[in-house]
Amino acid sequence: MSERKFFHFSKTGLFYGMNNLDDVIAESKEGGYIWLNYYKPEKDELMTLVEKLGIHPLSVEDCMDDNQVPKIEHFPDNTFIIFNAFNYAQKILHIDEINLFIGKNFLITVSGHNSDERKPLAEMEKIIAGDPGNIRLGPSGLLHRIMDFLVDQKFNAFEVLEEELEEAEDKILDNPAFFEPTELIRIRKCLQSLRKSLFHEREILVKICRLDCPFIIEKSIAHFRDIYDHLAKFFELTETYREIVTSLMELYTSLQNNLMTKSANETNASVRRLTLIATVFMPLTLIASIGGMSEWTMMTSDLSWKVSYPLFILAMAIIAVANYIIIRRIEKKGQFSGR
């Protein structure tokens, strides 16, 4: 559902809401400046600003497209800026596009086309009311306050990502077998999206700080430099966090390889023991099969040697012990020769 709020700001910093677009535009001609805040507007609603405030039709098209990258474009009557708001909740990164138009005596914000039910600028009216000094600088001061608010929201997203990276590291170290590596892949994708957005937003602030925009007064440039510093810091954080993700992936792979090696060694040890047992009993099985131990006379002809059975068992025991000793010596020789 679309919403719109219109405000007029006096030179002293006082502001009040108005309902009619023509009335608020007429009020701006008497002094002060205006803020037109649109949430999910229809295209026709924005097209009325083309004639009334000199907004370029292509900029209106960009406002309706939710797949734009941050940028700044200069026109004769205004400067068009696309900035992003970050919202990170339930392990999902939402990037909401904020469209801003700044002119000599107006600021227009358009948001909500890619934010579901989120309202990125819902708190701005309350924030502006508590910061009258900044908005006395005109549209430049209001633009700075909005961009500064959006940058603060980015910090919240980075805090949550840092906590998730620490949690992932603890899980990998505690029990790598039960860790899901897809978590790291998800975090890496989020960082890639953040990096892409921050890269373009830094370029916007560079152009603002070197006074490329004629509608931003020089007195407010110091405030925009502060925003640039924050964006540069966040950009460096994305690089740092990406390196941490890579390190955690390598750590996880290394620990998994260690577990597989340990499991393989245990399996080899079990097979070795079974092989030893089979090797010891193999000649005994052969002798027992030939001797036919189920009959007393199989090996004694017609004579019934009652001692033949115990002697045969004793011989088998001696052979078994001899086999065991021989096999152990062979294993030891193999170990020494392998060193």
Q: What is each PLM-predicted segment?
A:
Residues 1-219, 223-226, 230-240, 299, ...:
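Peripheral, non-transmembrane regulatory/ligand-interaction domains of membrane transport proteins
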Residues 232-339:
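Hydrophobic alpha-helical transmembrane segments and their immediately adjacent juxtamembrane loops
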